[in-house]
């Protein structure tokens, strides 16, 4: 349903943000 789609979208967005943040913190961008 719509809620599941939103949950998946939020998970993907959070994962991308976490990857970018960890990459900047480790200086490996």
Curated annotation (Swiss-Prot):
GO BP annotations listed: defense response to bacterium
InterPro entries, A to Z: Antimicrobial_frog_2 (IPR012521)
Keywords (A to Z) from UniProt: Amphibian defense peptide, Antibiotic, Antimicrobial, Disulfide bond, Secreted
Expression sites (tissue/organ): Expressed by the skin glands.
GO cellular component, one term: extracellular region
Subcellular location: Secreted
Name recorded for this polypeptide: Brevinin-2Ra
Disulfide cross-links: 23-29
Originating organism: Pelophylax ridibundus
Any one Pfam family match given in the protein's UniProt record, by short name: Antimicrobial_2
Superkingdom of origin organism: Eukaryota
The family this protein is said to belong to: Belongs to the frog skin active peptide (FSAP) family. Brevinin subfamily.
UniProt function note: Antimicrobial peptide.
């Amino acid at each position: 349903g719509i809620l599941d789609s939103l949950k998946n979208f939020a998970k993907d967005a959070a994962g991308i943000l976490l990857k970018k943040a960890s990459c900047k913190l480790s200086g490996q961008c």
